[in-house]
Curated annotation (Swiss-Prot):
Catalysed reaction, written as an equation: an (S)-2-haloacid + H2O = a (2R)-2-hydroxycarboxylate + a halide anion + H(+); an (R)-2-haloacid + H2O = a (2S)-2-hydroxycarboxylate + a halide anion + H(+)
Transmembrane segments: none
E.C. number(s) listed in UniProt: 3.8.1.10
Keyword Kinase: no
Homology family: Belongs to the HAD-like hydrolase superfamily. S-2-haloalkanoic acid dehalogenase family.
Name the UniProt record assigns to this protein: 2-haloacid dehalogenase, configuration-inverting
Impact when changing E69 to D/N/Q: Complete loss of activity
UniProt-reported outcome of changing D250N: Less than 10% activity
InterPro entries: 2-haloacid_dehalogenase_DehI
Alphabetically ordered keywords of this record: Hydrolase
GO molecular function: (R)-2-haloacid dehalogenase activity; (S)-2-haloacid dehalogenase activity; 2-haloacid dehalogenase (configuration-inverting) activity
Organism annotation: Pseudomonas sp. (strain 113)
């Protein structure tokens, strides 16, 4: 009798499974957004053959702008849960034998996640709004100015490498249980990419879940914070020069009614899921220092103000 894993991988086209045109698209997402992983939601939606290529083609010119980057900054800055700061895990990590260098590497990983998550919230907001025919750009009648339309450099920031996401099914039972417990605490459907990255340090992730995440999971403060950043993202995409996605009515010749219905649910789910993860991972970095440090764009291309 085969061993039944504690945690089953949610259906998706994972990084190592994407080849050909889809592999090229994943790399283009990496380099356009300057992020070291392709979001869980995109990997799930890539099972709908025609959607992600069409939605990305529409969004790419919009999300590669300074305006989009500023929107992600606004999301990040608003993602702090009100109330007391979480306990700093550094003493516990040092007691577990961690070196300062290892802690610095962990913090840098959190910075990479916190750079990317708000950008993915902008992305999923644009895709979800456009899917339903709501304003996801191009409807304001006012185009971006020359500063707002400046382009991000193409490619990962200097010194940043693509993340390795552990395979939940192949992880040991302790890690699988931990990923399952985090999933269930937030009523999610599967472990986020972020936790698959952080599972490389299971002792840290266990401390982080127990002391930083579990106490706020599903609280009113957490839910209000995620609602706030979803609103910021939704309002920001309306300022794009063109629609940041595709409407389901325009995909009806390439998708079955069942696929359209299924994808509608997936978009709705990830619009909330990515907001949850954005708030959670910023809180993990906040525990190491301050809200200001946790919400800072560590890979800023332009100064906060032009000049």
């Amino acid at each position: 009798m085969s061993h039944r894993p504690i945690l089953k991988n949610f259906p998706q086209v994972d990084h190592h499974q994407a080849s050909g045109k889809l592999g090229d698209l994943y790399n283009d997402i990496h380099d356009t957004l300057r992020v070291p992983w392709v979001a869980f939601g995109i990997r799930v939606m890539s099972q709908f053959e025609h959607f992600v290529p069409a939605a990305w083609e529409a969004l790419k010119p919009q999300i590669s702008t300074r305006y989009a980057e500023e929107g992600a900054d606004k999301v990040r800055e608003a993602a702090i849960i009100p109330g007391s700061a979480p306990a700093n895990p550094t003493p516990a990590l040092l007691a577990n034998g961690w070196s300062e260098e290892e802690i610095a590497k962990l913090k840098a990983t959190l910075d990479g996640l916190n750079y990317g998550n708000p950008k993915y919230l902008i992305l999923i907001s644009a895709w979800n709004e456009a899917w339903h025919g709501r304003d996801a750009g191009g409807g304001a009648g006012k185009r971006l100015d020359s500063v707002q339309s400046e382009r991000l450099p193409y490619g990962l920031p200097q010194g940043v490498e693509k993340f390795h996401l552990i395979d939940p099914e192949a992880a040991d039972d302790q890690v699988q249980c931990l990923l399952r417990d985090i999933r269930d605490a937030f009523l999610h459907h599967g472990p986020a990419s972020d936790y698959r990255v952080l599972a490389a340090w299971p002792d840290y992730l266990e401390i982080a879940f127990r002391d930083t995440l579990k106490p706020v999971a599903l609280t009113t403060e957490f839910e209000l914070t995620t609602s706030r950043i979803r609103k910021i993202a939704r309002e920001h995409v309306r300022g794009f020069d063109g629609a940041g996605g595709v409407a389901w009515r325009d995909m009806a010749d390439r998708m079955t009614p069942e696929e359209i219905a299924g994808l509608t649910g997936v978009l709705f789910m990830y619009n909330r899921f990515i907001a949850d993860i954005t708030v959670a991972i910023i809180r993990l970095k906040q525990a190491f220092g301050s809200a200001e440090d946790a919400t800072e764009n560590k890979f800023r291309v332009w100064p906060t103000e032009k000049g």
